[in-house]
Every structure is written in structure tokens, then in C-alpha cells.
Regions:
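Membrane-helix boundary elements
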Residues: 1, 109-133, 187
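Intrinsic-disorder/low-complexity, polar/charged segments
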Residues: 33, 58-64, 127, 158-159
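Membrane-interfacial loop-to-transmembrane alpha-helix junctions, especially the N-terminal start
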Residues: 30-45, 96-107, 158-171, 220-221
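C-terminal transmembrane-bundle signature of multipass membrane proteins
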Residues: 78-86, 142-221
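Hydrophobic alpha-helical transmembrane segments of multi-pass membrane proteins
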Residues: 9-23, 34-59, 71-81, 110-117, ...
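Non-cytosolic membrane-interface motifs at loop->transmembrane helix junctions
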Residues: 62-73, 126-137, 190-200
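Hydrophobic transmembrane alpha-helical segments in integral membrane proteins
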Residues: 1-19, 71, 119, 129-138
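Internal transmembrane alpha-helix with an interfacial aromatic "cap," most often the third helix
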Residues: 19-29, 54-65, 69-104, 115-122, ...
């Protein structure tokens, strides 16, 4: 298990480092939207989380459970994703009109599924500290996934603002599912599903920022 975790976390670190560096080069310029920069910062947090995992595996040979810098990085990443979608987009998109009520209710499916996934952690064989830390992480993933799904199905506004970032929101939603899946598979020690999940996470990490950039280039505002 050590070799697999070591190899996969190293590969994921480099994938996330490439994505983060690309985002910094493309979006951290004068006149670029804060929304884009916050998403890049979220990817940076994930990169730091994987760096911590690699260092921990090299020095101790195991992944530490409970609260640590790696877990804090995951929390930070989804907090950035949440703030980007809620603070920078949702307040402009949803004015609270009654006709849009169903687009506020349907996205609850995402956090409910994340919560159900967390039950496998809650009732799994792990420490109480790890259950609490995973619970806090899952809560942030739940909130972030709600807005990802909401912006995936919400009717477009004029200028194609929401339509052009739907692909990004789909990828971010997949990342949320993969992140809760990683918690589950690590506790259950399911090696093959974990490797498949890590490969998918590499693909998602590499494509997220370029897909976002391609979408925002179509904004006409």
C-alpha cells in the first residue's frame, strides 16, 4: 500500500502543480476576475496537501490520520471553491425569484450524496479525531458541491455568463465526489478503486483550469 500511495500522491502533486502554475500565469494579472484567482488558489491548496502527503510518506511510511496540514489543504481548497461560486457568482446570478426555486432545491442532491458517503467514514473503523476532521472536510465539500450543481443547471443569463462555466462546474463537482471517495477508500483500504480514483483526480486536476479559461474567454461582459 505504501508504494501505491507514494507513487500516486507524487503524480497528483505534479499534476496539481502544473495546473496551479498555469492558473497563476493566466489569471493573476491586472484586470482578471477574483473568481478565477480564487479557484486557482483552491488548486494551490490541493497541491500543498499532496506535497504534505508525499513528505509524510517519505519520512514515516504511512499517511497520518486526523488533523494535519494535508487535511487543512483540502479544507482550504473547497473553501476557496465555495467562496468563488457563492461570493462571486451566485449573488449576481440568483435574485431570489420564486420561479427559480426549483434550481435552489434540486442542487441539494449533491450535498446529500456527499453526506451519505461520509456515513461510511463515520461508521468506519478509524479514530474519533479522524471522523471529526473528515466531517468538517465533508461539510465544506457539501457546500461547495451544492453551488457547483446549482450553477450547472441554473438558467443562463444574458451574455452567456453561466453557460460558459458549466463545464468547469461539472469538473469541480466530480472533484468533490472523488475527494469524499478518497476518504472512504483509504479507511476501507480498497486499493484498486483508490488507484482508479487517483487517476481520475489527476485528469480532473489537469483539465480544471484550462476548461475554466476556455469558458471565461467566451464571456461578453
Amino acid at each position: 500500500m505504501y508504494e501505491i500511495l507514494m507513487y500516486m500522491n507524487t503524480i497528483m502533486f505534479f499534476c496539481m502543480a502544473v495546473s496551479f502554475t498555469y492558473g497563476v500565469v493566466r489569471f493573476f494579472k491586472k484586470g482578471k476576475a477574483l473568481y478565477l484567482q480564487m479557484i486557482v488558489c483552491g488548486m494551490g491548496c490541493m497541491m500543498l496537501s499532496r506535497a504534505y502527503h508525499v513528505i509524510t510518506l517519505l519520512t514515516t511510511g504511512v499517511l497520518t490520520e486526523g488533523f494535519h496540514v494535508g487535511r487543512l489543504g483540502i479544507m482550504g481548497s473547497f473553501l476557496f471553491f465555495l467562496c468563488a461560486n457563492y461570493g462571486q457568482v451566485d449573488k449576481l446570478l440568483d435574485d431570489g425569484a420564486k420561479e427559480n426555486r426549483k434550481y435552489r432545491i434540486i442542487p441539494l442532491v449533491a450535498p446529500v450524496l456527499i453526506w451519505l458517503g461520509y456515513q461510511m467514514v463515520l461508521f468506519g473503523v478509524t479514530t474519533v479525531e479522524n471522523k471529526v476532521v473528515c466531517g468538517v472536510t465533508a461539510a465544506l465539500i457539501m457546500f461547495a458541491s451544492y453551488f457547483n450543481l446549482k450553477h450547472l443547471i441554473f438558467p443562463d443569463v444574458e451574455f452567456g455568463f453561466i453557460r460558459n462555466i458549466r463545464n468547469y462546474n461539472l469538473i469541480a463537482l466530480i472533484l468533490a465526489v472523488l475527494s469524499i471517495g478518497e476518504m472512504i477508500f483509504l479507511i476501507l483500504e480498497w486499493i484498486v478503486p483508490l488507484v482508479i480514483l487517483y487517476i481520475m483526480m489527476c485528469v480532473v486536476s489537469l483539465t480544471m483550469i484550462p476548461v475554466l479559461e476556455r469558458g471565461v474567454k467566451k464571456w461578453t461582459i
